[in-house]
Regions:
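A short glycine-rich, His/Asp/Glu-containing loop-to-beta-strand
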Residues: 69-98
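Mixed-charge, glycine-accented linear interaction segment located at domain edges/termini
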Residues: 183-186
Length: 193
C-alpha cells in the first residue's frame, strides 16, 4: 500500500513548483528590461514566454496544496500564490464551484491563465464602441491544460464559467502587484445577449 505524502512534503513540493513558475515569469520579464509592461515591439516574445510559463505550471501535479484548491460557496475564490517583490506580476489560483462564473470583463493589465483541473467555459465578446456594450462572439470549452494570454484593453473581453458538475481550478497571472489582484485587473463591462 502506497503511503500518502505528509503535509510538510506537500507544502515543500508546492513551494518548489511555485519557485519554478516564478523563475519562468521572471525570465519573461528579462525580455522587457526597465519596464513592468511589455511594449508593442516586445509583446510577442513576452506573450510566448508567459504562455510557456503557464503551460509548464499546468503540467505540475504538485503546484497547489489542498488548501489552495478550496473553493467558496458565494463565488469563485482566489488564492494568491506569488506576489512579485517588484510589483510586476501576481499569480493566483482561482477555484470555481459548479455554476460559478466571472462577470463579463476586459482587462486593465495583461493577463494569462491556464486551466489546472476540471473545465471552464469561456465566452468571448467584441466591444461595440457605438453602444458601449460587449457583443457575444463565441463560446469555447477550456479543458485542463488550456492556456490563454491577452494584453490589456477591451480587445479580449470574456467571461469564464464552470458549467460542470465538479469544481474547476485555474491559474491566473496578472500584471499587477499582489495587493491589487482583486481590484486592479478586471474592467467590468455591460454585455448584450
Amino acid at each position: 500500500m502506497a503511503s500518502r505524502p505528509n503535509a510538510a512534503s506537500v507544502e515543500a513540493e508546492a513551494a518548489a513548483a511555485l519557485a519554478r513558475l516564478r523563475s519562468a515569469l521572471d525570465a519573461a520579464f528579462a525580455t522587457v528590461p526597465h519596464s513592468a509592461a511589455p511594449s508593442e515591439s516586445q509583446s510577442a516574445d513576452f506573450a510566448r514566454l508567459m504562455r510557456a510559463a503557464l503551460t509548464q505550471a499546468a503540467a505540475e501535479d504538485t503546484l497547489l496544496t489542498p488548501a489552495q484548491c478550496e473553493g467558496a460557496a458565494n463565488g469563485y475564490r482566489r488564492h494568491l500564490l506569488i506576489a512579485d517583490p517588484q510589483g510586476r506580476y501576481a499569480a493566483a489560483a482561482l477555484v470555481w464551484q459548479p455554476g460559478q462564473a466571472s462577470p463579463v470583463h476586459g482587462h486593465r493589465t495583461w493577463c494569462g491563465y491556464a486551466v489546472l483541473d476540471g473545465a471552464l467555459r469561456e465566452t468571448l465578446y467584441a466591444w461595440d464602441e457605438a453602444t458601449e456594450h460587449a457583443q457575444p462572439l463565441r463560446t469555447q470549452a477550456r479543458e485542463a491544460g488550456a492556456v490563454s494570454y491577452v494584453r490589456a484593453g477591451l480587445n479580449a473581453i470574456h467571461r469564464l464559467a464552470n458549467d460542470g458538475a465538479r469544481p474547476a481550478v485555474s491559474l491566473h497571472v496578472y500584471g499587477v502587484a499582489g495587493e491589487h489582484i482583486a481590484t486592479g485587473v478586471n474592467r467590468l463591462v455591460t454585455a448584450r445577449h
